């Protein structure tokens, strides 16, 4: 395990963007597999579980080409924007991250997955907006504390990995609201009632 960790750190030093992007893609795909297993368990335990490989590939691809690179550049930019150490710097970084970056990143993620799911068409803007606000509210229950830990304890070169590990669980939630047909039907029924 120590050799594997050393290899990862070496790749991180020599190829930071590629390493972070691939790690994020792997962990987002893992989160989606877990989300699918949980969705199956809560819906219909009698039928045999069948993994949706396209959905896993979509989440992994979004991690590699969207989330990983975005986080790499975001954390670098945040360190340039807010310099120094101490509690006030950590709080400033967390607030900027959560009030500016998080809504844009979540909206971007949902736009990309919506675009992929609907074969190039963006559908139902009103439902998209409701789901975005819902996701941002849930985000604020999890990520402020996670980011305080990230900005205070995690070395800058490992922040994307840390966020990606936390994102296994966060990705399960985003995957669920992006792909689960029953979730979309429940939201549409709430509109009608």
Swiss-Prot record:
Compartmental location: Membrane
InterPro entries, per database record: Mpv17_PMP22 (IPR007248)
Membrane topology label: Multi-pass membrane protein
GO cellular component terms attached to this protein's record: cytoplasm; membrane; mitochondrion
TM stretches of this protein: 56-78, 96-116, 132-152, 160-180
Major localization class: membrane
Cited Pfam families: Mpv17_PMP22 (PF04117)
Keyword terms, alphabetized: Membrane, Transmembrane, Transmembrane helix
Family: Belongs to the peroxisomal membrane protein PXMP2/4 family.
Name the record gives this protein: PXMP2/4 family protein 2
Organism: Dictyostelium discoideum
């Amino acid at each position: 395990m120590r050799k594997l960790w050393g290899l990862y750190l070496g790749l991180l030093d020599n190829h930071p963007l590629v390493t972070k992007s691939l790690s994020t893609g792997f962990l987002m795909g893992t989160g989606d597999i877990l989300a699918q297993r949980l969705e199956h368990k809560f819906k219909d335990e009698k039928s045999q579980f069948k993994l949706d490989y396209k959905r896993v590939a979509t989440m992994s691809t979004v991690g590699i080409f969207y989330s990983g690179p975005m986080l790499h550049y975001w954390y670098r930019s945040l360190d340039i924007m807010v310099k120094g150490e101490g509690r006030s710097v950590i709080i400033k970084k967390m607030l900027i991250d959560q009030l500016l970056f998080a809504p844009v990143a979540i909206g971007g993620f949902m736009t990309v997955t919506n675009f992929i799911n609907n074969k190039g068409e963006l559908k139902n803007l009103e439902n998209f907006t409701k789901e975005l606000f819902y996701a941002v509210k849930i985000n604020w229950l999890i990520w402020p504390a996670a980011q305080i830990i990230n900005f205070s304890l995690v070395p800058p070169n490992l922040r994307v990995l840390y966020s990606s590990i936390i994102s296994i669980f966060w990705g399960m939630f985003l995957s669920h609201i992006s792909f689960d047909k029953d979730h979309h039907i429940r939201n549409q029924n709430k509109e009608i009632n």
